Amino acid sequence: IKMESDFDWLAKPPRQKLFKIIPFKRPSSSFGYSQAVKGTWEQYKNETGNKLATRTRFKDSVDFIGWYTDKTESLLKISKKDAFRQYLAYHEGWGGYKDYKNNQKVIGLAKKVEKQSNKYKSQLQDCQKRLNKNKYIIF
């Protein structure tokens, strides 16, 4: 979510420009926290039965990403713990994943996601250590 929308619930890809100045159409239908495209969002709603899910609701976006990550693990055999390859599959789609090596920009983004993931893992481990160490302290 940090990489895709920077936690902006109304995030959309920037418009393309006609003649370098006139705002034109957007390059995709991605929208919301998860930047899910319409077709994949509809597939998520149908498969999960979550018909009222919206791309602007944080809870739904997080659930969507979990659903997508789970499907990526089963379809492409990419571990849920592999943030780099999971992000490549998320950004490029299940069909486009195989061609990611031709896209240096996406590889750079995936490296940033992997770095952020490692930071979150470290923070979580530090929290767990502190909570386990001070479990009998009353606030």
Language model segments and positions:
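Catalytic and substrate-binding regions of cell-wall glycan-acting enzymes that process beta-1,4-linked
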Residues: I22-R26, K81-K133
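Short, functionally critical alpha-helical segments immediately adjacent to catalytic or ligand/cofactor-binding
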Residues: I1-L18, I65, Q86-E92
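Divalent-cation-assisted or electrostatically stabilized phosphate/pyrophosphate-binding catalytic cores
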Residues: S29
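Short helix-coil transition/hinge motifs at the ends and kinks of transmembrane helices
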Residues: F19-K20, N50
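Short linear functional motifs in flexible/disordered or boundary regions
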Residues: K12-P13, A53, K77, K101-N102, ...
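Low-complexity, Gly/Ser/Thr/Pro-rich intrinsically disordered linker/tail segments
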Residues: K133-F139
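Alpha-helical segment that forms one wall of the substrate-binding/catalytic cleft
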Residues: Y33-R85, A89-Y97, S117
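Solvent-exposed, flexible loop/coil residues
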Residues: A11, K25, V37
